[in-house]
């Protein structure tokens, strides 16, 4: 059981992350032992579809991603998410190809704000932290995590920022929810 494994194993991560697929697999196989891995995956995707009210990009997201790429910037996604839920949403919104690489926490065993999650990206791509900036909408997982590895950050308060999220101490703060400001800096 993935949940029991994660809670019982001493982990090197301060913010461990489970992969929900083994949980879906256990539930599905209990009722249908012959279910295929593909069917388990599809069941996980369907749970997300059924329980999600809306999937859309923030205004100016595509413009910012395109603008950064045109400016020669590398763009990476570091997401606290389950791949089974998130990948189809990234594809549906048409932004997968806008990233140079995508790191999803369920694949890595840890999540933001764990510095190790950031280090996996930094080390894989040999990034110079002084040349990087984390853009996020959560003062704890996004901004504090970036600061923990010495990375500058840009905070955008959005409709899904944690309620009463304090304005973080970081290089840039945009409280109007418009990620488009990124292109102005």
What positions do the PLM features span?
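Asp-based, Mg2+/Mn2+-dependent phosphohydrolase catalytic module
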Residues: 37-38, 42, 62, 66-69, ...
């Amino acid at each position: 059981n993935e949940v029991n494994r994660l809670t019982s194993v001493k982990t090197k991560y301060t913010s461990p992350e489970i992969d929900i697929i083994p949980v879906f697999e256990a539930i599905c196989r209990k009722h249908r032992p012959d279910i295929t891995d593909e069917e388990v995956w599809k069941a996980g995707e369907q749970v997300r579809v059924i329980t999600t009210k809306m999937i859309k990009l923030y205004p100016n997201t595509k413009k910012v991603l395109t603008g950064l790429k045109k400016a020669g910037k590398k763009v990476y996604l570091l997401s606290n998410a389950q791949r089974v839920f998130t990948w189809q949403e990234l594809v549906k919104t048409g932004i997968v190809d806008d990233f140079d690489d995508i790191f999803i926490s369920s694949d890595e065993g840890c999540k933001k704000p764990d510095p190790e999650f950031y280090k996996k990206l930094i080390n894989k791509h040999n990034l110079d932290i002084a040349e990087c900036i984390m853009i996020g909408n959560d003062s704890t997982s996004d901004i504090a995590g970036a600061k923990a590895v010495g990375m500058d950050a840009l905070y955008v308060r959005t409709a899904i920022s944690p309620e009463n999220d304090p304005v973080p101490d970081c290089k840039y703060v945009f409280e109007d929810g418009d990620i488009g400001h990124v292109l102005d800096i």
